Amino acid sequence: MANAVRIKIGLKCQESGDINYTTWKNPKTHTEKFEVKKYCPRLKKHTTHKEVKLKS
């Protein structure tokens, strides 16, 4: 199982509070919080999305 180290995270919009995207992350190589500008369908514009833990 090569992907056993990777964890699934959600990307939460900082303006609307919605979790719009999910992705995978290796916490050993990327220790800082993931932050990226992505499209928010509720607000219909690009906003900052930050990493949140998902319930398994």
From Swiss-Prot:
Family matches, as InterPro entries: Ribosomal_bL33, Ribosomal_bL33_CS, Ribosomal_bL33_sf, Ribosomal_zn-bd
Source superkingdom: Bacteria
Keyword Ribonucleoprotein: yes
GO terms under biological process: translation
Keywords from the named record: Ribonucleoprotein, Ribosomal protein
UniProt cross-references to Gene3D superfamilies, sorted A to Z: Ribosomal protein L33 (2.20.28.120)
Keyword tRNA-binding among UniProt keywords: no
Stored SUPFAM superfamilies: Zn-binding ribosomal proteins (SSF57829)
GO cellular component entries: cytoplasm; ribonucleoprotein complex; ribosome
GO molecular function, one term: structural constituent of ribosome
Family the UniProt entry places it in: Belongs to the bacterial ribosomal protein bL33 family.
Cited PANTHER family: 50S RIBOSOMAL PROTEIN L33, CHLOROPLASTIC (PTHR43168), LARGE RIBOSOMAL SUBUNIT PROTEIN BL33A (PTHR43168:SF6)
Record protein name field: Large ribosomal subunit protein bL33
Upper taxonomic lineage: Bacteria, Pseudomonadati, Campylobacterota, Epsilonproteobacteria, Campylobacterales
